Design a protein with these regions (language model features):
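Charge-dense, helix-prone N-terminal extensions
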Residues: 1-132
Length: 132
């Protein structure tokens, strides 16, 4: 059994070339949108944290890749734009050969940050987060 990854590079390293490339592109997209975010591993998946709040993450799955907003309500706010993707309440699924568009990732991150600023996801005020 492989040891748990402690960094995003460690997470990506053993993946297939196709999944590593797809998630590497998503990582760069997220970093370009929120360059001030701290990279971390949360619940075993690569994640991005602003002011102590995880606002985005991704992982490889048996059938492809997933994006996580770390909220059960963020995806619902953009439901009309996500119809082409498989999803659960808290994850968006995509094929490694079909990258998530940068504009969509930007909207997902903005929605998550707005949700945390309003305290909507837990019914309480959120820490100050960067506006983009």
């Amino acid at each position: 059994m492989l040891a748990k990854a402690r960094t995003i590079n460690e997470y990506l390293s053993p993946l297939s070339t196709e999944k590593r490339a797809a998630l590497g592109r998503l990582r760069e997209t997220i970093r370009s949108i929120i360059p001030e975010a701290e990279e971390c591993i949360t619940y075993g998946i690569p994640s991005f944290r602003l002011a102590g709040v995880v606002v985005a993450g991704f992982c490889a799955t048996a059938k492809g890749c997933s994006y996580f907003p770390f909220s059960g309500s963020t995806l619902g706010t953009l439901a009309h734009e996500l119809q082409a993707y498989g999803q659960t309440k808290s994850s968006l699924h995509f094929r490694p050969d079909t990258a998530l568009p940068e504009t969509l990732v930007r909207k997902l991150i903005k929605a998550r940050i707005a949700e945390k600023k309003s305290g909507a996801s837990q019914g309480q005020p959120a820490p100050e987060l960067i506006s983009k």
